[in-house]
């Protein structure tokens, strides 16, 4: 492993500070990495020319292209496009997990080079403060995937490439060190090197060659060169700027300082970065120690330093977060309260928070425009999504401000509750609940707490804790069924028109599930229900099949309960199967229609549209789409028009099996709209020029076979997900006819033609509203008359005017009379009124409340006599089901007795 280093003149040494083994050309006491060595490049660039991020990315890819590597385009930062275990890409190797790294699928090129934007939110609280931490960074990587049959290159070549690249940009080889290490993760491990120069780590070279097992390390057949070069850091050392942010964000920083009026103090920033580089900030949640060290070094008061650095840190945070957001939103993440959408919203709201701290008058979308324009020089696909990004940020910023307004009252109420419990600060889980469930950021909690003399107790690493809790997809536990049978041949793929078949029975499990060697029964999957039908034995007995299920490639045919007794001695028998043809045809049309609806929705609503779930049905089908706002009626109509236009155009529906890598190279990750399909080979369903998906379902030969698509309704199923329901073919026609019947019947009721129905309904509705106004006016007059008649019934008890009556009025009048007697007319201090329906209203003024009598208690006390209950505010409460009015006098007297007892 070290042969190449020796050839390059490197000698093995041991760091006198950390004890790590490293390699260096010159003799040195330390390993070259922080905290053993201080940053030496700040104010002193160490390359032959200065590179911005775009420049070093071009240089990196060009170098490795010249050395036999195929450049590939970046993958989306949304890893869920091709894998189920994580939400976001955290390193370039994520691009190739699990399919390539498992050896199941060949890589898109071998060897290859990629500059992969990666997102890690585990240090989000350190961004802007240390000079180097970022939420989004570009990992330059060259990868090689080696097998015994096809070796590409391994350790020596990897070390040589790294050395030659760093030297090619002007870094003195005598300043480069290679620190020996060991990498472990994701069930694999192997030796590695951390490459440092001038006090900063620039790259990591990992050689994945072992599987981690309970019995120790086991060599794996696929040996992977997994490298990661920090391109932002390389740009930083080439420029020698005070922070990595200055080297990375270019004109975005300049524009932010211009509009905010913030001046960047290079002396403070440089010293802060140097000292932060000497500290293991990742393990320090409280950054006060860093601030103290910087203050001591510069002979400044720590509080004054914090005040000085806060706006500079905010500039860097806004620049970093808007870059992260640009990739997130351009790659299809919709901010929401769950999964990857939660992480996007977290970053977005932190951005707005720091914009507010800077006192910016600009909107978030104004800042995003700056970032999008800057990034688009390297990533044109981001500019293609500019309108979408701006629409989302405008909407999300508005939602954020609405959330803050609503949330303040919740925080105030919580403070009162905690004070009553003699608590002096918020527990962390309550702060997390404020943020997770109500969207209230800790800074808002802190501000309200100060106003109410309460300790917010916000952890320094609050956002890091939040992000860590939401970064990985929760694995769904599936109860496995062990089946020792060969996989079932899915014969319906050979001929989708086949409706009968013959097969051999291989076994029966759980007394009611038949396993065959082959089948045309479609097993439930991809949102498509299974086929149903019959299996006929050689003796003529017919078994009804109610459900087909696939487990690890084996199809289980569920037999109806009433036919389970017919399964004796069936194993080994040749049977005849038949599926319900009408059901299959309708589900087939529904499935192809779903592809058209998705494609039409994407054209109408935007490229961000992605399937979040689907369920095909006989009467109606639904599709869930990632979208950031409600779908309007006009948009629904346009989606329906487009989908039916494509039905009428009678496009071919092409179905073909592809090698997974070939399919991804040809079509991209839009293949996985309907979910991630496993396997080396995938079945691709393409409607040319309209839609393409990896799909295992049954489909029409042409779109014209669908007949008609009728959109029924939309629904918001969760934050960031919109549902479309629609009916297809005969079900669609029936829905159109049902709607026509409703219109015709309504027209008959009003005695007008259908064209006049909207105008007639509007006229009747307006007349009804006018009648309601008149009725309410008359009710008020009747209530006033009733009030006058009740004044003679008021009793003075112990100095308080009390009225208790049963009235023949409706609920609304009852409430109005009770309130007016106390508040408007002021003839009673307390009014307790019941109507013949058993409703009760109790109203009082502050004189009664000051004696400790609350109307909610009064209503429930009376309910003990009359059988009902209720509740409300201290001076106004309501109740119902006071049905035992024979005890009304007894109930009223109990209240009067309390009043008599007052001193």
Curated annotation (Swiss-Prot):
InterPro entries, per database record: aa-tRNA-synth_II/BPL/LPL, Ala-tRNA-lgiase_IIc, Ala-tRNA-ligase_IIc_anticod-bd, Ala-tRNA-synth_IIc_core, Ala-tRNA-synth_IIc_N, Ala-tRNA_lgiase_arc, Ala-tRNA_ligase, DHHA1_dom
Catalysed reactions, as listed in the record: tRNA(Ala) + L-alanine + ATP = L-alanyl-tRNA(Ala) + AMP + diphosphate
EC nos: 6.1.1.7
One term under GO cellular component: cytoplasm
Cited SUPFAM superfamilies: Class II aaRS and biotin synthetases (SSF55681), Putative anticodon-binding domain of alanyl-tRNA synthetase (AlaRS) (SSF101353), ThrRS/AlaRS common domain (SSF55186), Translation proteins (SSF50447)
One of the protein's GO biological processes: alanyl-tRNA aminoacylation
Key word DNA repair present: no
Protein name in the entry: Alanine--tRNA ligase
Source species taxonomy: Archaea, Methanobacteriati, Methanobacteriota, Methanomada group, Methanobacteria
